[in-house]
Amino acid sequence: KLAYVALDYEQELETSKSSSSQEKNYELPDGQVITVGAERFRCAEVLFQPSLIGMEAAGIHETTYNSIMKCDVDIRKDLYGNIVLSGGSTMFPGIADRMSKEITALAPSSMKIKVVAPPERKYSVWIGGSILASLSTFQQMWIAKTEYEESGPSIVHRKCF
């Protein structure tokens, strides 16, 4: 309700130290009112800088860039121009602008970057999985509990790849 993604994290952090402009009051279920300041944007920053919580992982912008760069050079332009955010973690206000800024900084300067954040993206992962599961070709990849118990994880490779 109060969290957002900062377009410029360092600048937002500096501003929060010298001003209370980002502070918002929030009423807890028990009626207690708390003031939330820099936490509003610091929590979402972990998506871009996992090192803030001690994780050695690339941020979502770097992961997106690396994924595009592993694809055939002929389709990269289309991929850069069609980055679609999906899932509940993309519901933070400001995430599309920040992704666009970060991908633009990583991508070749000639690339046109377009990041789309559809309003229904919170459920798009579920919708996609549901469509996939309903395809007749997908049913041959289903794994019964007994099959998994007999073969272990290797059954996934045999049936799905």
UniProtKB/Swiss-Prot annotation:
Any one GO CC term of the record: cytoplasm
Localization annotation: Cytoplasm, Cytoskeleton
Pfam families linked: Actin
First-level EC class: hydrolase
Keyword Nucleotide-binding in record: yes
Catalysed conversion reaction: ATP + H2O = ADP + phosphate + H(+)
Keywords from the named record: ATP-binding, Cytoplasm, Cytoskeleton, Hydrolase, Nucleotide-binding
Primary localization: cytoplasm
A GO molecular-function descriptor: hydrolase activity
EC number(s) reported in the record: 3.6.4.-
Function description: Actins are highly conserved proteins that are involved in various types of cell motility and are ubiquitously expressed in all eukaryotic cells.
PANTHER family listed in its UniProt record: ACTIN
Annotated family: Belongs to the actin family.
Name of this chain's protein: Actin
Organism of provenance: Pinus contorta
